[in-house]
UniProtKB/Swiss-Prot annotation:
It catalyses: uridine(2552) in 23S rRNA + S-adenosyl-L-methionine = 2'-O-methyluridine(2552) in 23S rRNA + S-adenosyl-L-homocysteine + H(+). It is found in: Cytoplasm. S-adenosyl-L-methionine binds at G60, W62, D80, D96, D121. Keywords: Cytoplasm, Methyltransferase, rRNA processing, S-adenosyl-L-methionine, Transferase. Specifically methylates the uridine in position 2552 of 23S rRNA at the 2'-O position of the ribose in the fully assembled 50S ribosomal subunit. This is Ribosomal RNA large subunit methyltransferase E. GO terms for cellular component: cytoplasm. It holds the Pfam family FtsJ. InterPro entries: RNA_methyltr_RlmE, RNA_MeTrfase_FtsJ_dom, rRNA-MeTfrase_E, SAM-dependent_MTases_sf. Belongs to the class I-like SAM-binding methyltransferase superfamily. RNA methyltransferase RlmE family. The active site is at K161 (proton acceptor).
């Protein structure tokens, strides 16, 4: 299939997508908000007054969904290397979360508050070549897991997008040593042909529990 035909097919599918239409009608910045909504309803990991960090947040659909679910309570801190237009009730930090200066700024923003939930909907710019895209995705996933290891409090949760493929099973095994419950989710808003899945780690183990597991 030619590039132009592929692009035309994507555009047609995109604009006829019910979740795209719903996002436009409800003022959500992306259809991804409804993937998160389904997971939150199913797994009930979000409660009032939580502190939530959204990695790779732009354009902001996940942050919007968290704020919608928590109302005026708690804090939502969105992090991204690219600029994100302001959202009511969302604190935004622009920068690379691997950067020590950015992490220092995050610590200042947190003011010692423990983090209840870390989200990551990050993905690399796709080339369409699996042998290139999958390692890039797993690299981002490892970075996000390291971030969650440091920032999520014991008993807290971590939700991340993965591409199912080389390295994903091993990654899930790593999470099983870190969280009491690990679940794999494929929301309705996730296109069937997409390799993406969402992995939830709930009930972060303490260091003593990790050592005994």
């Amino acid at each position: 299939m030619s590039h132009s035909k592929s692009s035309q097919r994507w555009l047609k599918e995109h604009f006829s997508d019910p979740f795209v239409k719903k996002a436009q009608a409800e003022g959500m910045r992306s259809r991804a908000a409804y993937k998160l909504e389904e997971i939150l309803k199913r797994d009930r990991i979000l409660r009032p007054n939580m502190v939530v960090i959204d990695l790779g947040a732009a354009p902001g659909g996940w942050s919007q969904q968290i704020r919608k679910q928590m109302g005026d309570s708690g804090r939502v801190i969105a992090l991204d290397i690219v600029k994100m237009a302001p959202l009511v009730g969302i604190e935004f930090l622009q920068g690379d979360f691997r950067d020590k200066a950015v992490l220092s700024q995050l610590e200042i923003m947190l003011k010692g508050q423990p983090v209840d939930l870390v989200l990551s909907d990050m993905a690399p710019n796709k080339s369409g070549i699996d042998v290139m895209d999958q390692p890039r995705m797993m690299y981002l996933a490892e970075l996000a897991m390291d971030f969650a290891d440091i920032h999520v409090k014991p008993g807290g949760s971590f939700l991340i997008k993965l591409f199912h493929g080389v390295g994903s099973d091993g990654y899930i095994r790593q999470l099983r040593h870190r969280y009491k419950k690990v679940a794999i989710r494929k929301p309705l808003a996730s296109r069937k042909r997409s390799p993406e899945v969402y992995i939830l780690g709930d009930g972060k183990l303490t260091q003593n529990e990790v050592s005994c597991s």
